[in-house]
Amino acid sequence: MPRKGHVTKRDVLADPVYNSKLVTKLINHLMIDGKRAKASSILYDAFNIVQDKTGKEPLDVFEEAMNNVMPVLEVRARRIGGSNYQIPVEVRPERRTTLGLRWLVSYARLRNEHTMDERLANEIIDASNNTGSAVKKREDVHRMAEANRAFAHYRF
């Protein structure tokens, strides 16, 4: 943590093709070893597959998928009186998008299709239909928060 003041968040530039900051953030999550061109080509190919399979605008399908993946509640561990409690807290908007993108990419990587663009496209389509592993992860997180609702009064 810095000793001198607060570190400001740097804003990402909007994507040149879809003019969306969310798409740029997805490219950044896809990127491995700084290979941005490779990550963006994977994403654009995935969006083409999404358009072919659904017949809808890929950005709309992606935003729908993100709305279905982003968590509203999560649990955070807090030590009270010698024991750890899982306390449900609301997720801040910035963290919601970060978690949604992280889960979407990580569960796309775990899929069994041949290429990464196919995996990502199918995960986006599944998430927009409220199915798929990323949506299941969100449901698990919400279920944990619901199960620990008794500790909500501790607050973080």
From Swiss-Prot:
It comes from the Bacteria. GO terms for biological process: translation. Keywords: Ribonucleoprotein, Ribosomal protein, RNA-binding, rRNA-binding, tRNA-binding. The keyword RNA-binding applies. PROSITE patterns: RIBOSOMAL_S7. The gene is rpsG. The keyword tRNA-binding applies. Belongs to the universal ribosomal protein uS7 family. SUPFAM superfamilies: Ribosomal protein S7. This is Small ribosomal subunit protein uS7. GO terms for cellular component: small ribosomal subunit. It comes from Lactobacillus acidophilus (strain ATCC 700396 / NCK56 / N2 / NCFM). One of the primary rRNA binding proteins, it binds directly to 16S rRNA where it nucleates assembly of the head domain of the 30S subunit. Is located at the subunit interface close to the decoding center, probably blocks exit of the E-site tRNA. InterPro entries: Ribosomal_uS7, Ribosomal_uS7_bac/org-type, Ribosomal_uS7_CS, Ribosomal_uS7_dom, Ribosomal_uS7_dom_sf. Pfam families: Ribosomal_S7 (PF00177). One of its GO terms (molecular function) is tRNA binding. Transmembrane segments: none annotated. Part of the 30S ribosomal subunit. Contacts proteins S9 and S11.
